[in-house]
């Protein structure tokens, strides 16, 4: 039976998964629209303006529904995760506020000018508007991923003994968090791949049916060039992201790789394995020697810690965390004797582990060896979902690289419409970016468990005092509403894609010159 924590996690996870069906396409499409319109302004060829307007209509559908699905996410921090909001709100809220004030308003203002400014702006002004929408979309992703990156690697903050919550000490450390920076570029690049694949798939559909040949060939060419560069960048930055994870989240990396034991350097990479959580081992594993050590440490002599070793390392932190937790209870009840405060300051870095232990030890004054053992096992995520979601992401990314390279070669040869198998391959590859992105998001968030904020706040302690009935009702409502949004997206996209660019010829604007 699911409890409040499970239902809260499911609600946020499903909300984010639905929302992230729309976000990557927004990031990718708007950048491609800016490129198409730039070609129009530079060359004066109106076909590129027509392409911008046609793909822009599909972008508008996706943008509107993406905004709608994102609204409830920020509210859930207050409704479902109130302790989280109180405990780290001063830090976590800063990048979200910057996103709203700087990025979202910029994006929202200029997206209206993009759609309704064709007859009111000259082509140079409209091009500037399009690039500003693209800049705003990417800036929005930057601030949101700064917030998420801080959850993975909390820098520039400390526990304030007066307010009994986390406070920011350095805004620059939050902004330039190395995990955030790598996550931002990796995620945005994945969005570019999504936009490119979307345009290529629909263009391939037109070419297979002998429709909209001029627009489809040019769109496919732009998509294949842009998409190839983007998928190469995505895979390269994925390697950088994994390296950062190895440095700051070794438990997540070990779960991603099904690494139970610390093996001699350089560690092998498990291509496939069957992790068994209860036995703390893999039932079987197919390995590539040395590859994991090279990827995770960029060396041949550094070991990759295994989950058993990492669990053992949590024991002293749980002990110190227990003492910090007990001292915090004294301080919160008014005991601020200098020796108490001094003792707490020496232990506050492990307070999160005390919160984690409290889930397994109702009486923190008397913690048994079995309770410590349960907390140690609870300090790692379920390995199989993390292990397989990582491989789904990498597998889809590798297939996308192959598709993009084949499409690019045939495009450069000028024979793309002569090879129907390439067009069919592009069409049937349309779901791959979304599968990769959703699997990657799941791996990133689920692999951080049991932490809401890595090593600082367990998910167990972050929730609100709601009932299961309240959460079940709101979960059903959100899933139902978001499913309707998704159906609307698919219907409208299919409708206007089937109509094609030629259906818009009668409504072409006369753009101001100058």
UniProtKB/Swiss-Prot annotation:
Provide the record's note on post-translational modification.
The N-terminus is blocked.
Major subcellular site: membrane
In the UniProt record for this chain, what is stated about the effect of gene disruption?
3-fold decreased ubiquinone levels but no change in redox levels of the ubiquinone pool (in aerobically grown minimal medium with glucose).
The portions of this protein that span the membrane are 23-42, 95-114, 130-149, 188-207, 220-239, 393-412, 471-490
Q: Which GO terms describe its biological process?
A: aerobic electron transport chain
Q: What reaction(s) does this enzyme catalyze? A: 2 a ubiquinol + O2 + n H(+)(in) = 2 a ubiquinone + 2 H2O + n H(+)(out)
Which residues does heme 1 bind? 19
Pathway field: Energy metabolism; oxidative phosphorylation
Listed under GO cellular component are: cytochrome complex; membrane; plasma membrane
Q: Which residues lie on this side of the membrane: Periplasmic?
A: 43-94, 150-187, 240-392, 491-514
User: What is the regulation of this protein's activity?
Assistant: Inhibited by cyanide; is more sensitive to cyanide than cytochrome bd-I oxidase.
Q: Which residues lie on this side of the membrane: Cytoplasmic?
A: 1-22, 115-129, 208-219, 413-470
UniProt cofactor(s): heme
Cofactor binding note of this UniProt entry: May bind up to 3 heme groups per complex.
Residues that bind heme 2: 186, 393
Q: Give the record's keywords alphabetically.
A: Cell inner membrane, Cell membrane, Electron transport, Heme, Iron, Membrane, Metal-binding, Translocase, Transmembrane, Transmembrane helix, Transport
Self-association state and partner proteins as the record states: Heterodimer of subunits I and II.
Q: Which family does it belong to?
A: Belongs to the cytochrome ubiquinol oxidase subunit 1 family.
Full protein name: Cytochrome bd-II ubiquinol oxidase subunit 1
């Amino acid at each position: 039976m699911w409890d409040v924590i499970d239902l809260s996690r499911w609600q946020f996870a499903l909300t984010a998964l639905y929302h992230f069906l729309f976000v990557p396409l927004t990031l990718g499409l708007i950048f491609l629209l800016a490129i198409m319109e730039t070609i129009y302004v530079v060359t004066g060829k109106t076909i590129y303006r027509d392409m911008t307007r046609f793909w822009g209509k599909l972008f508008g559908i996706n943008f509107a529904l993406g905004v709608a699905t994102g609204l409830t996410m920020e509210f859930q921090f207050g409704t479902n995760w109130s302790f989280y909001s109180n405990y780290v709100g001063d830090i976590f809220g800063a990048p979200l506020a910057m996103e709203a004030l700087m990025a979202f308003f910029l994006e929202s203002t200029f997206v209206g000018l993009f759609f309704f400014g064709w007859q009111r702006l000259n082509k140079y002004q409209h091009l500037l508007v399009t690039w500003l929408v693209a800049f705003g979309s990417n800036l929005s992703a930057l601030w949101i991923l700064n917030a998420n990156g801080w959850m993975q690697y909390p820098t520039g903050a400390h526990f304030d003994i007066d307010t009994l919550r986390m406070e920011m000490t350095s805004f620059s450390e939050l902004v330039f968090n190395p995990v955030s920076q790598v996550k931002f570029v990796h995620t945005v690049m994945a969005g570019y791949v999504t936009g490119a694949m979307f345009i290529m798939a629909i263009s391939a559909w037109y070419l297979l049916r002998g429709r909209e040949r001029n627009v489809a060939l040019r769109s496919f060419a732009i998509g294949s060039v842009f998409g190839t560069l983007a998928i190469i960048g995505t895979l390269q930055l994925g390697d950088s992201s994994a390296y950062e994870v190895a440095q700051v989240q070794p438990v997540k990396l070990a779960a991603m790789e099904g690494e139970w034991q610390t093996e001699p350097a350089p560690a092998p990479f498990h291509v496939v394995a069957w992790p068994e959580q209860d036995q703390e081992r893999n039932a079987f594993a197919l390995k590539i020697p040395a590859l994991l050590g090279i990827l995770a440490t960029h060396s041949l002599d550094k070991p990759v810690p295994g989950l058993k070793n990492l669990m053992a390392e949590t024991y002293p932190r749980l002990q110190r965390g227990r003492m910090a937790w007990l001292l915090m209870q004294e301080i919160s009840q008014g005991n601020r004797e200098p020796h108490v405060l001094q003792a707490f300051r020496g232990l506050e870095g492990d307070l999160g582990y005390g919160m984690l232990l409290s889930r397994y030890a109702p009486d923190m004054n008397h913690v048994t060896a079995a309770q410590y053992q349960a907390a140690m096992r609870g300090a790692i995520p379920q390995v199989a979902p993390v292990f397989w979601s990582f491989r789904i992401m990498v597998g889809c990314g590798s297939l996308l690289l192959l598709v993009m390279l084949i499409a690019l070669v045939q495009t450069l040869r000028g024979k793309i419409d002569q090879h129907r198998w390439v067009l069919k391959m592009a069409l049937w590859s349309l779901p791959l970016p979304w599968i990769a992105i959703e699997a990657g998001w799941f791996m990133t968030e689920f692999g951080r468990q049991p932490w809401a904020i890595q090593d600082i706040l367990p998910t167990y302690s972050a929730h609100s005092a709601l009932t299961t009935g309240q959460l079940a009702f709101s979960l059903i409502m959100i899933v139902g509403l978001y499913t309707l949004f998704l159906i609307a997206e698919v219907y409208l996209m299919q409708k206007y894609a089937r109509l094609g660019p030629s259906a818009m010829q009668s409504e072409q604007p006369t753009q101001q010159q100058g």
